[in-house]
Amino acid sequence: IVKPRRHVVHVWELNDAEAAELGPLLQQVTRVLAALVEPEQVYVTLWSHMHAVPGHIHFVVQPVTAARMEEYDGLHGLRLQLAMFERRDAMPADEVNAIAARVRAHLAAG
């Protein structure tokens, strides 16, 4: 997940500095994930609702492999994400934390 440090409900509320940082950061994170996971695609999806009320914006950055799409009968994009949500299919927290640590290390190394 990539999100602004400051509480923001809408993208248009980002100040110029935050907006200028966001695009390159998403590019860097997806580039590192592509190198680490070798996915078919890295989805970047903006979410902000919590119980039908806009909350803090955050971008879900999700590497998706061909094998994962095959598990879901070839679904991709939003349909794949919805099917995964319906099944409550998520990586275990320890795996997410391990990948996040590797991404942070790559970003810190430049």
Regions found by a protein language model. Give the residues of each.
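HIT superfamily nucleotide-processing domains
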Residues: 1-110
